A protein has these predicted regions:
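Short, conserved glycine- and acidic-residue-centered signature motifs
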Residues: 25, 100-103, 153, 157
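Walker A/P-loop phosphate-binding motif and the immediately C-terminal alpha-helix
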Residues: 2-45
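Short, ordered loop/turn segments at secondary-structure junctions
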Residues: 17, 44-46, 82, 91-92, ...
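Hydrophobic/aromatic beta-strand patches that form the interior of the parallel beta-sheet core
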Residues: 10, 85-87, 144
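Conserved catalytic-core segment of NTP-binding enzymes
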Residues: 120, 125-167
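Short, high-confidence coil segments that cap the C-terminus of an alpha-helix
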Residues: 37, 118-119
Length: 167
């Protein structure tokens, strides 16, 4: 994800699930694309990915195919009808829920090697502060935490921000 030359890498996180993180990520990606920017959205929720559903597209391959070595990162990318390039995460695959630091680092390196010329890479994180979320957020030049107006969402967002600023 070290596309520092021209690509802005934006991480969208939350302390708690169900606060609208994917909705914010998808809408940001589509809005930037509509403004004429070249945008890629990475669904980095390793076990419950659903950005492809929000974008209304079918993805024959996902991140699990890349991590297994079956496909390259470039081979799993799909272009949505909105023009956004999507790196689909995996959903319902148990091994993806326990991704290790080494695999997260491999994903970050794979993004750096992509030839795609993009202006914005939006990274839709899983909820919480897992090692994968922290690794992906560390690779982002801009970080946003989505929060709802309920006490547990606010408390979890605050805890997430505290952990993120320690990195």
């Amino acid at each position: 994800m070290d596309k520092a030359k021209t690509t802005q890498v934006i991480g969208i996180a939350s302390g708690k699930g169900g606060v609208g993180k994917t909705t914010v990520s998808v809408n940001l990606a589509v809005a930037l694309q509509a403004m004429g920017h070249r945008v890629m959205l990475f669904d980095a929720d390793m076990s419950l990915a659903n950005a492809q559903i929000a974008l209304g597209c079918r993805c024959p391959y996902n991140l699990s195919h890349f991590l297994s070595g079956e496909k390259t990162l470039a081979e799993i990318i799909v272009t949505t009808r909105q023009g956004v390039k999507l790196v689909p995460g995996a959903s319902g695959i148990q091994e993806m829920a326990a991704l290790g630091d080494i695999q997260a680092s491999n994903i970050v390196r794979a993004f750096s090697a992509l030839d795609d010329d993009i202006d914005f890479l939006i990274v839709d994180m899983a909820a919480g502060i897992s090692p994968e979320v922290l690794a992906f957020m560390a690779a982002c030049s801009r970080r946003f935490v989505v929060v709802r107006d309920d006490p547990s969402s606010i408390a979890d967002a605050y805890a997430t921000i505290k952990v993120l600023i320690q990195d």
